């Protein structure tokens, strides 16, 4: 599908991995246990914070995805730093009045919006701010269910009654907190096949060329691609790649919805895949993952999402093309629609449970589809 010329692999210095946590009192650390990453929140004197770490363990036990647990860990570390700055504790928050609690959490939203939770005061999108606060609220709910703290007043459910035009009384349950930011409309520009080819040509190694080609050609999620085990998931006779659900991927890659499905590769991309494995047999020998880190102290470890985003950012500077894994997945869906694929086939290829999700994903209305 794409011209993925093989080139000699160049030596390059990887961008330093993003530091976990920030330079404030509380930060996130991860440890490997049973071949799975476990997240903890520790203080600046290297003490484990018991309550948030207990909650993160609970998320592991209910089989939340590693990325969900990681996201919750960072959100709670930010919130604990905010509490430290405000010199107030969890128990004191629960004693505040409704209006005081409401103000406290709105202030937290603005605090992360301004980037005070990061070392470099990097501003945060409304959607991400809301995600952080949602994680904090779920933590408070967990503590309430464990009888550690009373339920927050802003999280108590209110019942609202109203009469319709026929005089029938209805009751709806609504959450009390209304302070979430209005989320920005997604502004993800479409990417063209020419731009994808330009990105591939700008890559400095065969791994990145193959990764971009596969994302655009299969419609697989980034986590699904990074979770591919070349020893188990590739059918060399049928030219297919299988998505498998695994909990133990050390790079946090996981198939969403615990699903299994296959993606067919074009002749060109499959030939490149085979040659990539053959040429990199030595470096792949100690790993079962198709995509691994190429240089540095972590050489040979499974490639993770942060490294992919860093790679796309470098390519953006070289080509002036802003790209994103989701953008490449959306490209796949749009191309299949143009080719006349049935909507259910597109749904299955994308791994959506409901066709309504696919319709929304394509940004189309029922009539046109």
PLM feature spans:
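Active-site/catalytic core of tyrosine-dependent DNA strand-transfer enzymes
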Residues: 266-320
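Basic, Lys/Arg- and aromatic-enriched nucleic-acid-binding interface segment
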Residues: 189-222
């Amino acid at each position: 599908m794409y011209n993925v010329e093989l080139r000699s692999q160049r030596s390059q210095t990887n961008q330093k991995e993003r530091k976990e946590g920030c330079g404030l009192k509380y930060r996130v650390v991860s440890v490997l246990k049973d071949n799975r990453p476990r997240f903890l929140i520790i203080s600046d004197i290297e003490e484990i914070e018991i309550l948030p770490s207990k909650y993160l363990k609970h998320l592991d036990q209910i089989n939340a995805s590693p990325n969900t647990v990681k996201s919750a860990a960072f959100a709670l570390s930010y919130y604990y730093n905010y509490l430290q700055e405000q010199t107030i504790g969890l128990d004191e928050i629960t004693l505040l009045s409704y209006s005081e609690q409401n103000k406290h959490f709105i202030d937290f939203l603005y605090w992360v919006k301004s980037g005070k939770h990061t070392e470099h005061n990097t501003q945060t999108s409304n959607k991400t701010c809301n995600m952080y606060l949602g994680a904090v609220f779920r933590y408070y709910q967990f503590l309430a269910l464990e009888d550690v703290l009373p339920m927050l007043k802003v999280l108590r459910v209110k019942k609202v009654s109203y009469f319709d035009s026929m005089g029938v009384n209805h009751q709806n349950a609504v959450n009390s907190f209304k302070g979430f930011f209005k989320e920005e409309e997604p502004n993800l520009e479409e990417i063209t096949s020419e731009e994808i080819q330009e990105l591939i040509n700008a890559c400095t190694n065969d791994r990145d060329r193959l990764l971009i080609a596969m994302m655009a050609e299969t419609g697989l999620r980034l986590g699904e691609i990074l979770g591919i085990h070349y020893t188990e998931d590739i059918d060399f006779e049928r030219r297919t790649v299988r998505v498998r659900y695994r909990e133990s991927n050390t790079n946090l890659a996981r198939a969403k919805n615990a699903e299994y499905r296959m993606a067919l590769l074009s002749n060109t991309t499959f030939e490149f895949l085979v040659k990539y494995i053959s040429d990199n047999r030595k470096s792949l020998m100690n790993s079962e993952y198709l995509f691994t880190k190429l240089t540095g102290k972590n050489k040979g470890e499974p490639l993770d999402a942060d490294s992919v985003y860093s790679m796309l950012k470098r390519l953006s500077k070289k080509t002036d093309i802003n790209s994103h894994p989701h953008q490449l997945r959306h490209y796949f869906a749009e191309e299949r629609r143009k080719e006349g694929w049935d909507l259910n086939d597109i749904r299955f290829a994308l791994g959506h449970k409901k066709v309504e999700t696919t319709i929304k994903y394509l940004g189309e209305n029922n009539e046109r589809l």
